[in-house]
Amino acid sequence: DENFNFSGQGSDKYSQQFDGNIKFKCFPNWPSEVSEKSEYVSLYPNVMLGIHIDHFYAFWLEPISNNQTKEHFELYYIGDESASSDEFKGIREKNFAFWQEVMNEDVTAIEGMQNGRNSPAYNGGNFSPVMDTPTLMFHKWVATNLTK
């Protein structure tokens, strides 16, 4: 629907982080039968939210110039103990390192695509109807808002 300002995808493969016997507290009403599900929602034009049984994050992009973007990333945990106690410091660091690695996996590809867009041979790119539905929805959102 072109009236929506978001898109996203889910996963059935989320695994809680452990540090020895320590694991983050979970959302109290999260059903156990969907404990491995997670959702990743993009709010247009520049915010991505990720929610899991034991934490969530906000990731947003700040355009600095036509060729530079600053990334912001914040993790949030359930309850004061998971969020700030010394007992959970190690697992918070482990979780941050995990998400940092996941986000960094895309940097080379994204920078390469942006560099390619400067080429006169660039044709706009090819999208997969299976994997790129959120990108298509974003393009429709941009086109709709540019014509208002």
Predicted features and spans:
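C-terminal catalytic domain of Rieske-type non-heme iron oxygenases
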Residues: D1-K148
